[in-house]
């Protein structure tokens, strides 16, 4: 579906191009079916290769965050590019989701918990 890797027990999702109304539902279903419903509750969403993101996709991110939070897990956005970071800021999503510059920084935070 989308590029990913699992390091220790952390799922690192690495979508590319766009997250928008055309693929957000598929992305959400895939994340829930392949990871959340199988007990993974630590997920990083790497946004460095995402060229654009729309409000529908932001809603999907919030849904994933709520699910992970309710299970005591850890969710973070990693290395959003400038354009995506601007959208996160304008929508105040950067206030409710942890954002890290690198995967290593996010991994350090997970290990501390």
Curated annotation (Swiss-Prot):
The keyword Phosphoprotein applies. Phosphorylated on a serine residue. It comes from the Bacteria. The modification Phosphoserine is found at residue 55. Transmembrane segments: none annotated. Residues 1-110 form the STAS domain. GO terms for molecular function: anti-sigma factor antagonist activity. Keywords: Phosphoprotein. Belongs to the anti-sigma-factor antagonist family. In the phosphorylated form it could act as an anti-anti-sigma factor that counteracts an anti-sigma factor and thus releases a sigma factor from inhibition. This is Putative anti-sigma factor antagonist TM_1081. It comes from Thermotoga maritima (strain ATCC 43589 / DSM 3109 / JCM 10099 / NBRC 100826 / MSB8). The lineage of its organism: Bacteria, Thermotogati, Thermotogota, Thermotogae, Thermotogales.
């Amino acid at each position: 579906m989308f590029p990913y890797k699992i390091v220790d027990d952390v799922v690192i999702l690495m979508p590319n191009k766009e997250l928008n109304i055309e693929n957000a539902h598929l992305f959400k279903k895939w994340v829930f079916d392949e990871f959340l419903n199988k007990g993974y509750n630590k997920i990083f969403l790497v946004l460095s290769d995402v060229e654009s993101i729309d409000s529908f996709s932001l809603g999907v991110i919030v849904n994933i965050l709520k699910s992970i939070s309710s299970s005591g897990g850890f969710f973070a956005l990693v290395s959003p590019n400038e354009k995506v970071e601007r959208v996160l800021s304008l929508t105040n999503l950067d206030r409710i989701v942890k954002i890290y510059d690198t995967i290593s920084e996010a991994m350090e935070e997970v290990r501390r918990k």
